[in-house]
């Protein structure tokens, strides 16, 4: 597994200040996010766990997965969670030319427009404009891609805590530790509702929801 940061370095936040890394808050609020779905069985399980604690979250969905499983995508929206674009084919921005990358985002948009309802954050009108959320797969974007994506009306959402549930070389306990040791008020935490991450997700998410709910935290979606 290639190296990655569990806690996003301050330098990254400074260099890419146009991206959202954390939502500053004096309140006890956390922002859970789930990438790469919708995935049959796993996304529904995630929704069930969130429902137990009346927790809201943000799901960054892959367009082709929405097309294959629209009923799961609609379930996310019906339960009043936020949704965001995660490209159509989980592209790596560093390995994709800007024109092709933007086209892939637009292809993904078509699924959002076809299957989303007015409850979807991505389609909510804000002062006459659409509020859109986007997260680049792998967190990788070029400066050119970033600039043009924002011109498309997207707010680029990153994170300040990476659970690393995708890493097959770490234990379930280490994944939980990654989250517990680094969370603070307003943290944006990354999980994945994918097959690859499912074992760690099912171990960690219930414990995070229980522990922080007991500590008086609320879980909100990103707007």
Task: State where each predicted segment sits.
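Active-site beta->alpha N-cap acidic-glycine motif
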Residues: 3-94, 100, 104-114
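His/Asp/Glu-enriched short active-site or ligand-binding loop at hydrolase and phosphoryl-transfer sites
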Residues: 140-181, 216-223
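CE4/NodB-like, metal-dependent polysaccharide N-deacetylase domain
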Residues: 47-56, 60, 82, 98-143, ...
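A cross-domain feature marking catalytic cores of carbohydrate-active enzymes
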Residues: 34-36, 61-64, 85-87, 136-138, ...
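Catalytic grooves of carbohydrate-active enzymes
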Residues: 180, 184-196, 200-223
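Short histidine/acidic/glycine/proline-rich micro-motifs that form metal-
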Residues: 63-66, 90-92, 140, 162-167, ...
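Short gly/ser/thr-rich secondary-structure transition/capping motifs
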Residues: 12-18, 137-138, 169-170
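Charged helix-capping and loop-helix junction motifs
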Residues: 71-74, 98-105, 171-177, 202-206
């Amino acid at each position: 597994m290639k190296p990655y940061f569990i806690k996003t370095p301050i330098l990254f936040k400074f260099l890419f200040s146009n991206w959202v890394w954390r939502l500053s808050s004096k309140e006890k609020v956390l922002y859970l996010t789930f990438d790469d779905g919708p995935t049959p069985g796993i996304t529904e399980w995630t929704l069930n766990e969130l429902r137990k604690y009346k927790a809201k979250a943000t799901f960054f969905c892959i367009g082709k997965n929405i097309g294959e499983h629209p009923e799961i995508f609609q379930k996310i929206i019906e339960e009043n969670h936020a949704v965001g674009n995660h490209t159509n084919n989980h592209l790596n921005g560093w390995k994709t030319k800007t024109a092709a990358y933007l086209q892939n985002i637009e292809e993904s948009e078509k699924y959002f427009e076809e299957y989303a309802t007015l409850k979807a954050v991505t389609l909510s009108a804000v002062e006459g404009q659409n509020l859109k959320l986007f997260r680049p797969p792998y967190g990788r974007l070029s400066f050119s891609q970033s600039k043009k994506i924002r011109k498309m009306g997207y707010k680029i959402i990153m994170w300040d805590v990476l659970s690393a549930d995708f890493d097959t070389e770490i234990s379930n306990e280490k994944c939980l530790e990654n989250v517990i040791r680094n969370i603070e008020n307003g943290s944006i935490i990354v999980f994945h509702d994918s097959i690859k991450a499912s074992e760690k997700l099912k171990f960690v998410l219930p414990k995070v929801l229980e522990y922080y709910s007991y500590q008086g935290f609320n879980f909100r979606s990103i707007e």
